[in-house]
Amino acid sequence: VTLPASLDEAVAALAATPAAVPVAGGTDLMASVNAGQLRPTALVGLGRVREIRGWQYLDGHALLGAGLTHARMGRPDFAALIPALAAAARAAGPPQIRNAGTLGGNIATGAPSGDTLPVLAALEATLVVASPGGGRREVSVSHLLAGMDMLRGGELIGWVRVPLLHAPQIFLKATGRTGPGRATASVALVVDPARREVRCAIGAIAPMPLRPLEAERWAASLIDWDGERGLPQESLTAFGTYVATACVPDPEVPADGGEPPKLPPAVLHLRRTVAALARRALGRALS
């Protein structure tokens, strides 16, 4: 186990030992080890890297350290900064998980049920990645999760750059009857008056958060941005249906032109869950 004192030292340690696995809170790593899915031959511990534990303000953005724990992000001072991310952090499992798990770990693991991921997608956050030799580059969170721009050998997530919107933002999730609050579906929604946009990301139902772009544009077109910005209940319901149909689509029509297969009951339930979450999120954001 290597215990570097700075981010650049950690990157150098990873570059020197390509098989090493970085570890901060270790919540996902230990689960993989206990399940027999991972047997790391070397670890690079990030617990002493103080520069990635806090946050700072920079040009209308918050620069969040990758070592921020969910427990820290759930506190009131952080909630005043980025309410949806704080709500997601508070929902991230039992206290022992929130106390250990980190923002950077949530992103790097990329588990579909990661609560912070749809929030970061809806906020259009970017990553500041540390590279060997002291280099830095920026990567869109959505591009990383979609596999369009992956971390390279020896790289580590240093910070997450999040726009400070001062705009309504909501995070909601649905959980199963068992397990430590693991999401079966989640939604993050932002109403951005400055850009006159609605941005929505659905989590936990696919390998990466899904952005229903047409539904976003449709909802934005209905809002009176210069007035009260409210929408009637039927519009909120239609938005939920629009989002759910986009994210949980109908089966394709067979090539022979026959009847498409019906959605299984579990998939229908998931679609109804997504519709309800999206409807509630937009309603709360506009209220």
Model segments located where?
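C-terminal structural segment of proteins
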Residues: 1-287
